[in-house]
């Protein structure tokens, strides 16, 4: 377990993994919410380096006019995730969830808790999305079932598609 508190930490970790000849099959980024905060300085610099952002004097990228900061945060997150994904064949992203309304209906679903469109875009690029919860028997379950409650869950690999995996049983 290695703790990173900045994008430069992540770059150093990736460099060390490359120098060690890629020893890991899996890398876990825990959490993506923390990564979203980490990339904000990078996103701010990316925005300032554009013609539209060259006169921006704010310190918070999300204060950029016309929502431009959100797309830069998304670009920065994608760049960091792409960097990490070159370090191992499998990257697991741990995300927090939020309750989201579906259109104008009274239906609420769980979705990835990231700003703007980032959660939806991240979902579309993922091979599998599971929702971790405790069932009625207090078992720890990772669900890849797409249903009316966990709409962003699902999996492209057939061995995970529409499956509930019990990770721990209550004794």
What residue spans do the PLM features occupy?
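Conserved GTP-binding G-domain of TRAFAC-class P-loop NTPases and closely related GTPase folds
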Residues: 83, 98-171
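Conserved, well-folded catalytic cores of nucleic-acid-processing
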Residues: 16-20, 38, 94, 125, ...
